[in-house]
């Protein structure tokens, strides 16, 4: 996801990265995109916001993270960052992906499967060991 994919005036959805990492559910905060720069996107809290009247100190900056293209992250140095999505559908897909990754990493008892079943899973995933 790139900054140029957003437009000024667009309603976007932010989530605490902590909530998504710990699978606490999707509790969105709605923001309105106020400014778009080369490195940062600035958004104002709320859905029905007149972005021309919001002072700069109330705008929250978001940037493209180096490690993923799935979302934008809040530009802060400490604490839990908020992550920004252009719509709820993309946010739900990302949350579902995190749940599946966690489930497949720790929720499945792989030892209970036979060798043939594990080889079939390996074929489906297309990975070599």
Where are the model-predicted features located?
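Cystatin/cathelin-like cysteine-protease inhibitor module
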Residues: 7-9, 13-15, 43, 113, ...
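Short coil-to-beta transition motif at edge beta-strands of beta-rich domains
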Residues: 1-24
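Short, solvent-exposed secondary-structure boundary/capping segments
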Residues: 39-47
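Residue-level detector of intrinsically disordered, flexible termini
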Residues: 13, 33, 42-43, 90
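Intrinsically disordered, low-complexity, charged/polar segments
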Residues: 46-129
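Short beta-strand-centered aromatic/proline hotspots
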Residues: 23-38
